Amino acid sequence: MAELLTIDIHTHILPENIPDFGSKYGYRGFIHLDHHRPGCARMMMDDKFFREVQANCWDPEVRIGECDQHRVDVQVLSTVPVMFSYWAKPQDTLDLSMFLNDHIAGIVHRWPKRFIGLGAIPMQDPELAIQELERCKRIGL
């Protein structure tokens, strides 16, 4: 009998470095990371503290080590839900989704036996959502 895989289907990941989307788009409310000490960062919404995260939130190699410790063979990666930004302008959310999806796709391509990726889409605009969903499929999510 074949050995069964242990798959963690509910995990979240962020890019280690998130651009200043507020400056890029011209309005506030977007998350960025404040790396205030090694292996630890504050998720900030503008200047307001949102949540503390550890390196396993952005470092796939740390995740692989933790998965090995817990006998998890594969993780399904998705962005942290606050990053969806459904309140933002649809075109900006598309741009943000593409950034996040490219990040996850890069991890999946580098470690295809360890990670599966789920994409984010701009749900406030069905046509843009379909456009990004189709792109997610093309990039391996």
Question: Where are each of the predicted segments found?
Answer:
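Helix-coil boundary/capping segments in enzymes
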Residues: 1-141
